[in-house]
């Protein structure tokens, strides 16, 4: 099979600028907020939070120009990353490649961050585990155990950029499986086999508001935080130390909390609880 998803993708700016993306973003609506300029002579690793059910805020902001990414961050080319398994589906993979998506594998990340300045890879850090915690009014993040994206950033001297989407968890209702043995067992088994899980969720229908797979209309506001420089490896050092990883993670979490606390009373007035890092 063609390995474009591992080698930088096959993006089409024409496809990314189709009018349909504006209709998609305006449905919720989705908007993008910038905390700081990004230097196009550098590379970046965006951490996207929370995962939500299917990360539709990330789709609207980073695979199209519907929210004006290139106007806010001139000279920066974003690549939203996803699992390799998504590129095994004929035709669907071609759409993913056309909108600038690529694999989240180590090989793909290395290739993208080595391709030249102005590259930003976007990683939905919490992954499948976090999707099971996506409930309206909450923001339970799986982050403390996630050090791989920080290690990758240090290897390539790419600044880390915390990104938080208010409303991502509010566009679907999810049946809580934490106390339902059979559902939870099936979900964890599926995750082990295929690398992702299947939350039991529902939205609205096309002709009704009660149940269906269409997401509920709820504003999604994605705030892109300030870039965090990463430590340099010493001559002869091939891997960052645990201290370097944890100290960088602490700075990352601090900036993530800063943008959450700055905007939570504006964009999350109906929240049930504040952001929590649960794992």
Predicted stretch roles:
Residues 231, 255, 259-266:
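Hydrophobic alpha-helical segments
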Residues 9-12, 16-228, 235-238:
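Soluble catalytic domains of membrane acyltransferases
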Residues 119-120, 127-130, 249, 253, ...:
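Structured cytosolic regulatory/catalytic domains appended to multi-pass membrane proteins
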Residues 230, 240-243, 270-272:
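Charged, glycine-interspersed solvent-exposed loop segments at helix/strand-loop junctions
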Residues 56, 163, 262, 266-269:
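Generic macromolecular interface patches on structured domains
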Residues 220-223, 243-260:
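Pol beta-like nucleotidyltransferase catalytic core
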Residues 265-279:
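C-terminal helix/juxtamembrane-tail motif
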Residues 1-8:
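Hydrophobic alpha-helical membrane-embedded segments
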């Amino acid at each position: 099979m063609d390995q474009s998803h591992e080698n930088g993708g096959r993006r089409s700016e024409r496809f990314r600028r189709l009018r349909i993306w504006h209709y998609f973003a305006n449905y919720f609506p989705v908007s993008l907020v910038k905390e700081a300029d990004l230097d196009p002579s550098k590379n970046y690793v965006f951490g996207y939070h929370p995962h939500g059910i299917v990360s539709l805020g990330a789709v609207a902001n980073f695979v199209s120009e519907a929210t004006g990414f290139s106007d806010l961050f001139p000279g920066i080319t974003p690549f939203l990353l996803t699992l390799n398994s998504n590129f095994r589906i004929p035709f669907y993979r071609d759409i993913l490649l056309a909108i600038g998506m690529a694999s989240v594998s180590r090989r793909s990340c290395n290739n993208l961050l080595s391709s030249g300045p102005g590259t930003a890879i976007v990683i939905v850090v919490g992954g499948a585990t976090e999707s099971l915690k996506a409930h309206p009014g909450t923001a339970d993040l799986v982050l403390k155990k996630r050090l791989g994206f920080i290690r990758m950033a240090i290897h390539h001297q790419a600044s880390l950029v915390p990104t938080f989407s208010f409303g991502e968890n509010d566009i679907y209702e999810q049946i809580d499986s934490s106390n339902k043995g059979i559902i939870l067992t099936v979900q964890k088994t599926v995750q082990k086999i295929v690398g992702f899980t299947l939350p039991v969720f529902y939205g609205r229908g096309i002709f009704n508001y009660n149940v269906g797979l269409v997401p509920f209309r709820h504003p999604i506001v994605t705030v892109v935080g300030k870039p965090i420089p990463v430590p340099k490896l010493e001559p002869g050092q091939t891997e960052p130390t645990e201290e370097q990883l944890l100290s960088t993670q602490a700075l990352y979490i601090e900036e993530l909390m800063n943008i959450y606390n700055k905007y939570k009373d504006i964009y999350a007035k109906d929240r049930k609880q504040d952001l929590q890092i649960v794992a």
